[in-house]
Design a protein with these regions (language model features):
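Bacterial Sec-dependent N-terminal signal peptides
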Residues: 1-13
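Intrinsic-disorder/low-complexity accessory segments
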Residues: 10-110, 114-138, 193, 199-201, ...
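Short, internal active-site loops enriched in acidic
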Residues: 54, 146-150, 224-226
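Active-site neighborhood of phospho(di)ester-bond hydrolases with catalytic His/Asp-centered motifs
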Residues: 102-103, 143-145, 218-221, 670
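Short, conserved secondary-structure transition motifs
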Residues: 138-154
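Aromatic- and acidic-residue-enriched segments that line the glycan-binding/catalytic groove
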Residues: 152-169
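Core alpha/beta catalytic barrel or barrel-like domain that forms the active/cofactor pocket
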Residues: 172-197, 218-234, 296-298
Length: 832
């Protein structure tokens, strides 16, 4: 392989260790782990660390490789890299470049791990003069598989279905994975969209380790469709303007070096197309916004390629070919890092020093108001910590003037001691800017992912972007005292309802057989106002706990950091007493979630993860093919994630589902599942755009040649209907349980043009788009015109049951924190 390979009698090659030539079959994860352990036990210049484990218990590994001299001082090298990233120490002549190679974040892009074994071997091979020379001024970290659970799902499938010889016909069984495929992790999350948000166990452990090293160069290895040539940097537009000229320049240098080796072999490749650098949570952009040179490398193949597959041009793409390509770019990248080591270290140092002394962008501070929602504020603070962003609370300035994210205006506001204050004059100000800027500038509207993600909208917290620097007054907020055990025996305990933590508290109470109620209307007692949605835990009905009732409730509150109000009477000062029918009992729901072929594994996984890992609340997952087996008498809530449903197209199955709803069931339909209901007789209709039709007809009559468009402009024309992910302002009816806990406005991440007609006759329009609801992110001209005056979130009453429509996904990638309460309302409060 391009002169990189040489014999070594000490360290076994992958072929020797595995007992088969690399590329003739896919290697299970445990054998990959065994090989890395063998190399670490044999070679003197490699250190192996297990930095974590997956949800299914598989080890997550990283191999650190360097020259013997560098390995002898590896902790000093790591610490100096960390100091540079914190603007605490400048470059020195002996600091090597840390190159981090991440393989197989998408499980069914399974060539990457095979290539990682070959790369490790050549780096520790003393007989390879090239790699040993490169290691004099580089330290290479290899993570052979970021997603072992997903990869094992694919490898097991392929090894179980292939024949004695690989079948190259792509319609054969071995080239067609069953649902959900191996791309995602155990909970079907795309780990390559989770770097910044760190919602998944694998991401949390990996990024924590990454941030202990802060490498100067990071490569994320992928695969794409079978017919695609190899892709490597430089990336496509749009580039976020936080990316520096040097970062662009080094991408070009590395790309040219990769091209040199590909040209020698006559291999096809492309650059500067398709894969942009904008969304902040990729394996290339996250390192970029943290000072490194981040790159994605994409080999043609992926889950349908198997060991060998026939391409449309008649060539056979083999696993051996794919390994060779990824191995070559791995080595080529390390080569450039070695050649440019001094410049890379110098620019890396300057990056963080400049970020601290002169932060980019017009805003120099951000203030996030607590506003009575310390739980959400604490959740945001935790995300900032995970991303090395410094912050504090309160300020010596009593007030300031800044851009209000919610009103879109510059306003004067007060700064309270509980408010979170972030000063941009810090080493990680570029990441701060990317996550907080109200509107990110797009240099090209053709992009690969969502185009808006500002955290104040994602968390639903009133925030201000300030052009002047503000210094936090304290590193931590005032300590919240635990709820004390009352000496008296209160009539009831009251708990707020406005954050995920409140839902976790409710989940725990219900599972411990505590009877909980909530109020449908506001009330006042003891001189304090309580909004609709407030949880009420009365002593009456909970006598089974006996003398332990008070101790149990307060211990639960302290576990979830919930502040309780104890009241001595059910007689309120204003509003409805606790015996009123406006005080609703919360029945512990039995929840069923559908999955299976045709249903979005991502959407289903987000819900599954939400119940199991965030709420710790039981849920039954059923394949849609097996809905006839559901015990409908034991099912209170049925959730339909985004997807296509055969049962909704089948009249008998659909009628059975309607009967269940009429008898008291609650059907929650998300995204395209809601659209499928609109296509049937469910009393829900997609919004018709008669005005747009008339406008188009008028345009044709007045401009008859309007339809004559150049073929070369077809991509630009198509994005007129495109909405990859933009933020819209939703007006809420906060008197309905679906919107309890909100202040009247919800910010949604809109990813399609679906909007529903306002409902009448037993329908409640809880969340609607009115005119001028757009806030930020790219929206095609035609789609933007459509997105007004329609329903996004609603409840349709049907007999004794309800249908909850959630046109947008409130659990998107689990980072849209403000949507979690909306979804929880649909599960726990609606219809009670």
């Amino acid at each position: 392989m391009l002169g990189f390979l040489a014999a070594n009698a000490q360290v076994p090659t992958p072929d020797q260790f595995l007992g088969y030539p690399l590329g003739t079959q896919f290697t299970p994860h445990y054998r990959v782990v065994d090989y890395f352990k063998q190399v670490a036990a044999t070679a003197k210049n490699v250190k192996l660390e297990q930095y974590g484990a997956t949800y299914e218990g598989r080890p997550l590994l990283m191999a650190i490789v360097g020259s013997p001299e560098n390995m002898a001082r590896i902790e000093e090298i790591r610490q100096h890299s960390l100091d540079m990233s914190n603007a605490k120490g400048g470059a020195n002549g002996s600091q090597p470049v840390i190159v981090w190679l991440s393989y197989n974040v998408h499980g069914n892009e399974a060539v990457s791990t095979e290539a990682a074994m070959q790369a490790l071997y050549e780096l520790v091979n003393n007989g390879n003069a090239q790699t040993q020379q490169w290691l004099k001024n580089t330290v290479v970290i290899i993570d052979p598989c970021l997603n072992p659970d997903g990869r094992e799902r694919y490898v097991n499938f392929y090894n179980n279905t292939r024949g004695v010889k690989p079948n190259v016909n792509r319609w054969s069984r071995e080239h067609n994975e069953p649902w959900p495929g191996g791309r995602a992790n155990h909970y079907y999350f795309d780990l390559n969209r989770d770097w910044a948000w760190q919602t998944q166990k694998e991401s949390q452990q990996r990024v924590a380790k990454y941030n202990q090293w802060m490498p100067q160069l990071h490569v994320d290895f992928h695969e794409q469709e079978i017919e695609a040539p190899y892709y490597f940097a430089p990336a496509a537009e749009p580039f976020h303007d936080a990316i520096t000229p040097w970062q662009r320049q080094l991408q070009v240098l590395i790309g040219r070096n990769n091209a040199k080796y590909f040209d020698q072999q006559g291999w096809l490749y492309f650059t500067k197309e398709r894969f942009d650098l904008f969304y902040p949570s990729y394996g290339d952009t996250y390192p970029m916004y943290n000072g490194a040179i981040g790159m994605t490398y994409e080999q043609g193949g992926s889950g349908r390629a198997g060991v060998a597959v026939l391409k449309k041009d008649g060539d056979t793409l083999t696993l051996t070919d794919r390994i060779a390509h990824h191995f070559t770019t791995s080595m080529s990248t390390i080569e450039v890092a070695s050649q440019q080591a001094e410049k890379i270290i110098s620019e890396y140092t300057q990056y963080f020093e400049a970020a601290k002394k002169n932060p980019q962008g017009g805003y120099k501070s951000y203030v996030v108001k607590a506003g009575g929602n310390t739980e959400k504020l604490n959740s945001l603070a935790e995300l900032l910590r995970k991303n090395n962003i410094a912050f504090g609370f309160g300020s010596n300035a009593a007030s300031a003037s800044g851009f209000n994210y919610f009103t879109g205006k510059t306003e004067t506001f007060t700064i309270d001691k509980e408010d979170l204050v972030i000063n941009a004059f810090q080493p990680h100000s570029n990441m701060l800017r990317v996550l907080f800027e109200p509107v990110s500038h797009l240099t090209d509207s053709v992009t690969y992912d969502i185009t808006a993600w500002a955290l104040p909208y994602a968390y639903g917290l009133t925030s201000f972007a300030v052009k002047a620097p503000l210094t936090p007054a304290a590193d931590a907020p005032a300590v919240r005292n635990n709820t004390p055990l009352s000496a008296q025996k209160p009539y009831a305990y009251l708990a707020q309802w406005n954050s995920l933590r409140d839902v976790k508290f409710l989940s725990s109470l219900l599972q411990n057989d505590i009877k909980v109620r909530f109020t449908e209307t506001p009330f006042s007692v003891g001189g304090k106002d309580f909004p609709a949605g407030t949880l009420i835990i009365t002593r009456a009905g909970n006598t089974a706990k006996g003398d332990q009732f008070d101790r149990f409730i307060t211990s639960q509150a302290n576990q979830f950091k919930i502040s309780l109000d104890a009241v001595a009477s059910g007689f309120v000062d204003k509003g409805m007493d606790f015996g009123s029918d406006k005080i609703r009992f919360i029945k512990k729901p039995h929840v069923t979630l559908l999955g299976g072929r045709g249903i979005s594994s991502l959407g289903m996984g987000e819900i599954w993860h939400f119940f199991e890992q965030q709420l710790d609340f039981p849920i039954t997952v059923v394949d849609e093919r097996n809905t006839d087996d559901i015990d409908w008498d034991q099912t209170d809530v049925l959730i339909l994630p985004d997807g296509d449903y055969k049962m909704l197209a089948d009249k008998a199955a659909s009628d059975k589902l309607k009967e269940w709803v009429k008898n008291g069931g609650r059907l929650i339909a998300l995204e395209s599942a809601a659209a499928e209901l609109a296509g049937g007789e469910w009393g829900i209709k997609l919004k018709k755009e008669e005005e747009d039709k008339e406008a188009k007809e008028k345009a044709v009559s007045t401009r008859p040649y309007e339809a004559l468009k150049p073929y070369a402009n077809r991509e630009r024309e198509s994005i007129k209907q495109f909405i990859p992910g933009a933020i819209y302002k939703v007006q809420l009816d906060t008197t309905h349980p679906l919107a309890f806990g909100y202040a009247g406005i919800y910010y949604t991440l809109k990813q399609d043009a679906n909007l529903y007609e306002f409902m009448e006759n037993g329908g409640w329009n809880v969340g609607v788009l009115k005119k001028d609801s757009y806030l930020s992110g790219f929206v095609g001209a035609d789609t933007r015109q459509q997105l007004k005056d329609g329903l996004l979130f609603g409840v349709k009453e049907m007999g004794d049951g309800e249908i909850v429509i959630l046109a947008d996904n409130p659990l998107f990638r689990s980072f849209w924190e403000n949507g979690k309460l909306l979804f929880s309302n649909a599960v726990f409060l609606v219809g009670q």
